[in-house]
Amino acid sequence: MKNYDVIIIGTGAANIVADAAIADHKSVAIIERGKFGGTCLNRGCIPTKILVTAANRIREIREAAHLGIHVESVHADWAAVSRRMWHKINENDSIRTYYEQFKNVTVYAGTASFVDKKTVRITDANNHTEEITGTAIIIATGGRTHVPSVAGLQESGYITSETFFGAAYPPEPYKSLIIIGGGPIGCEFAHVFNAFGTHVTLVQHNIRLLPKEDESVSAYMLQQFEDYRIQVHLNQDTLSVRTENGEKILTCSDRTNGKKIEVHAEEILVAPGIKPLSDILHTERAGLATDARGYIRTNEFLETNVPGIWALGDCNGQAPFRHKANYEAETLAHNLFSHQPTENWRWVRYDAVPAVTYTYPETAHIGWTEASAKKAGFTVETAINHYSATAKGYALGFEEGARNDGFVKLVLDKDSKKILGVHIVGPEASILLQPFCNLFYCGTQTIQIREAEIASPTAARLRKLPLTRTLPPLSVYTLSETMTPHPALSELTMWTRYYYEKK
């Protein structure tokens, strides 16, 4: 049985940890059951944003008349857009080749599962198995679509974001599409296909669209979807699916009054959220503690309850975003392989995780919503500024009082004037959010304890100090510890730090 200094399960954000371990001359095993690069690069952030950007341009051209630009027709070439997308996805094949060149790295193609606290079994596509052991094990397995139990759904067939970017990818836009789920994934797909001419019906269990956004943003986006003739049914229980005359028919009922409706479409996209892969990983064999949903519990140093095992990314249940996973990976790589004194260890914080939904227009936020801040006991005041109130906003075509007039909303602590949250809906909201992200991370921070019962001896000691960290606002190193919404264009400025020769 082969033994490694480091075993890494998953090749998304965990590649940051792999690179640090390789540079530190550790023997490394990398295990991947799918395509290298993880969800984001292959079936998430990157391919969806290529489709979203094309959809944005379609909308902008169609709406150019209010700027005095008249276009007779728009031809959307789905095949050409798709070729660009697949070209980008296929670039990820080089990631495996990159890691295979290192003498201290072994790449395993297969599904990882625990045998015990130090042993991992790899099962390949031919059902052959091999067991390896590791001194340090990094879990970064991501998540998968949560498919609800709906009568007839399996028999009628459906797609998810995973299968969509695979064999189920359509050669042309669907004529009609039902989307189950009104979170970021469902709303982005609704925008894309609506722009390309698909009749889209969105069915949402929650009483709000994009329920993790501030209520003002949710209301704005619902209005925009309705204006674009996306049919939205909120507060619905999905009851059953059947197929008739080549169409899929979904029956749902209002959760308040029980009224049933039926919606018809060529295809159904299931996107109500994600769940972890703990069952496939067999976390119980390693004695790993998980929460009620199956996510691996981690502390502020990404330690699990099992010494020598860490978890990052979607699998730990904390904000399923690639930029959050990158931030965690940078933190873990620093702590494990930088050879810094433990007093220089970094910790993760989740009170300042930016989030962006790439609809038309974009939504972006960081920190508390108005409602959550009030619930937490803050005395809250807000400030709202609309796009139309700025010269550039007017130049873009926004007018005061118009239904599409986007805005920035600040949620403030009335007593201290501290910014508690920022919420933006409008063009390039993801870029406009970045200055606030930087503000949230600058200055002196004190360790925030998570999962107090999970504590290595080092973690316990650092908590008692308590550990603090100062991030100067003009230091290039501060950029390394500041989250940047992925894949916003603000990465162009924030990631320039990687070209600093002494990084």
Positions of the model-derived regions?
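Short hydrophobic core segments
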Residues: I7-I9, A112, E131-G142, I179-I180, ...
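Beta1/beta-strand and adjacent pyrophosphate-binding region of the FAD-binding site
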Residues: M1-G12, P173-G183
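Flexible, glycine-rich terminal cap/loop adjacent to redox cofactors
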Residues: Y4-A14, A20-G34, T39, I46, ...
